[in-house]
Regions:
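Cap/lid and interdomain-hinge subdomains that line or gate substrate/regulatory clefts
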Residues: 1-3, 7, 14-17, 29-32, ...
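Hydrophobic beta-strand segments of well-ordered beta-sheets in folded domains
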Residues: 3, 38-42, 110, 200-202, ...
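Pocket-edge structural micro-motifs
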Residues: 7, 44-45, 114, 206, ...
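Short, glycine/serine-rich, charged loops/turns that create anion-binding
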Residues: 10, 47, 86, 117, ...
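N-terminal domain-start signal
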Residues: 20, 45-46
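Short beta-strand/loop segment at the start of cytosolic alpha/beta domains
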Residues: 22-25, 294
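Acidic, glycine-rich loop-and-beta core segments that form the ion-binding/anion-interacting portion
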Residues: 219-294
Length: 294
């Protein structure tokens, strides 16, 4: 099973390790991803920084090259496509999966899983929260490009689709459903997932990794007979691929610094660009604990 993650900005790989992050998507580069030893690779599309039209063109180009590579090689393993998006609901959340479905589909369903457990960004009863605060009450909702007024993911997805999908056709997989879920054929939730078709849109509640693991195990069983697409934040990727991030020491990261011929560390440059308050706090902490000069 190979997981292909099309990432809308550079942070999607933060919960995994030991996989390729492709900065280009020509056919020869994509082939390296498919032939890599890892069951997972990322394509950095960076579409969150693009207009709707340019984002769609980029995703379409990536998809066409993916189809070319896949058709030219007889890959025996299942391929699962993941559109990695923001855990604070910014970005082209409907447009990008829609473009993927048009080019690589048709899919039986698209699952929306914006939970980022490490950042306390959770989906409960269909609404999204940051550290228990409804997402529409946070600074992220005031984004000048991707702002929104609701924490209800179903309502937001419908609004972002510009009525291309019916509100009633968007389904929820609630925590109570996941509690009941198992991979037995007679399980009522399992059967509901198995019967999804015509690219149903399903919003998945998540508040911890055990729920993600249970969902991921069922998906891996169903994927042999169903064709599913995913629009998710980073936590689902580590769950489904079983490649959780590895904690590293300060010595490990310091060894990544570039050295000169005498093996002394060369100076580096840190560029920070964000209006989010958390980034300001992180920058101030960096200036306090290091010899960085602004």
């Amino acid at each position: 099973m190979k997981f292909v993650v099309i990432d809308d900005d550079p942070t999607g790989s933060q919960t995994v390790h030991d996989c390729l992050l492709l900065l280009k998507w020509d056919c020869s580069t994509l082939l390296k991803g498919f032939e890599s030893n890892s069951n997972l690779f990322f394509i950095l599309a960076n579409t969150r920084s693009l207009s709707e039209n340019d984002a769609k063109l980029t995703i379409t180009e990536i998809c066409k090259n993916l189809k070319t590579v896949i058709s030219s090689k007889a890959f025996e393993e299942e391929i699962i496509f993941i559109s990695r998006g923001d855990s604070t609901l910014r970005g082209h959340n409907f447009l990008e999966p829609s473009a993927l479905n048009s080019c690589l589909g048709p899919f039986d369903a698209t699952f929306y899983i914006p939970a980022f457990i490490e950042g306390k960004r959770l989906t409960i009863n269909g609404s999204h929260f940051v550290d228990k605060i409804p997402i529409n009450q946070t600074i992220f909702a005031s984004d000048k490009i991707f702002g929104y007024e609701t924490s209800n993911v179903k309502k937001l997805l419908f609004q972002q689709s510009k009525s291309q999908i019916n509100f009633e056709d968007i389904q929820n997989l609630f925590l109570s459903d996941i509690e009941m879920l198992n991979d037995e054929e007679n399980n009522i939730v399992y059967k509901a997932l198995k019967n999804l078709n015509n690219n149903k849109h399903v919003i998945v509640d998540v508040e911890n990794y055990s729920q993600l693991k249970k969902f991921s195990l069922v998906i891996k069983k169903l994927i042999k007979q169903k064709k599913f697409l995913f629009r998710t934040a980073a936590s689902f990727i580590s769950s489904i691929s079983e490649k959780k991030s590895v904690s590293q020491s300060e010595i490990f990261f310091s060894n990544l610094r570039i050295r000169n011929k005498e093996k002394s560390f060369l100076p580096g440059l840190i560029i920070v660009g964000s209006y989010v308050e958390l980034s300001t706090i992180q920058l101030n902490n960096l200036l306090e604990i290091s010899n960085c000069n602004p």
